[in-house]
């Protein structure tokens, strides 16, 4: 199984469980504090960066050589997302992923046509920086650059296209179940809850 978490409820018991039972752990961090705290807030509206980063560092250190990824989302506020990836690397994380926001075009977080030039340039900057880090003996992994040219796509990816409902599910803090985190809140896609 894979556990994806925003880190808010991580404690020693969660770390022990995740490292014992989960083949992979995905830790949600959008990068720099000011970027992360724009959208990742608690019920009181306070940013979560200061609370989760030490928990993530502790979990990753305890995890040893088991799989994990730091997974962030870039938006209109940070089309220069390599700064956020490099920040994660500076925090000691080496397994990185950063994906574009998925939202309605009128949402203030939505990427614009003007952002795309900046975004495209980021991938070139990232590749060059990864080579530099490799030469310095401090490599990082970027999930979206991982290619398997010999094995090809897995059969379930050929059939289903993504893991929604077959490979993973989203569980809300209230226990509602959805086939994917992108469906959370869409009543038509609610599968049930953990209570029934």
Give the residues covered by each predicted segment.
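Conserved beta-strand termini and adjacent loop/short-helix elements that scaffold enzyme active sites
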Residues: 99-101, 143-145, 194
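Short clusters of hydrophobic/aromatic residues that line enzyme substrate/ligand-binding pockets
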Residues: 36, 162, 191
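Flexible loop/turn segments at secondary-structure boundaries
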Residues: 9-11, 34-35, 77-79, 104-106, ...
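Membrane-interface junctions of multi-pass transporters
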Residues: 185-196
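A C-terminal junction/extension of Radical SAM enzymes
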Residues: 107-187
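Radical SAM/AdoMet-radical enzyme domain recognition
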Residues: 1-101
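Residues that form generic nucleotide/phosphate-binding pockets
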Residues: 55, 129, 194
């Amino acid at each position: 199984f894979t556990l994806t978490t925003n880190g808010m409820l991580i404690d020693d018991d969660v770390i022990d469980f995740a490292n014992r039972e989960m083949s992979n752990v995905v830790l949600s961090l959008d990068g720099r504090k000011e970027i992360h705290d724009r959208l990742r807030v608690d019920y009181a509206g306070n940013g979560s960066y200061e609370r989760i980063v030490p928990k993530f560092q502790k979990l990753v250190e305890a995890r040893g050589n088991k799989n994990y990824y730091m997974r962030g989302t870039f938006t209109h506020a940070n089309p220069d997302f390599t700064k956020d990836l490099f920040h994660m690397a500076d925090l000691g994380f080496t397994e990185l992923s950063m994906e574009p926001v998925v939202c309605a075009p009128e949402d203030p977080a939505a990427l614009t046509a003007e952002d795309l030039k900046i975004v495209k340039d980021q991938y070139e900057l990232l590749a060059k920086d990864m080579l530099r880090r490799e030469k310095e003996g401090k490599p990082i992994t970027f999930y979206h650059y991982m290619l398997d040219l010999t094995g090809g796509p897995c059969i379930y990816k050929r059939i289903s296209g993504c893991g929604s409902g077959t490979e993973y599910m989203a569980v809300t803090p209230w226990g509602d179940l959805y086939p994917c985190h992108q469906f959370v809140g869409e009543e038509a896609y609610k599968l049930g809850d953990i209570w029934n």
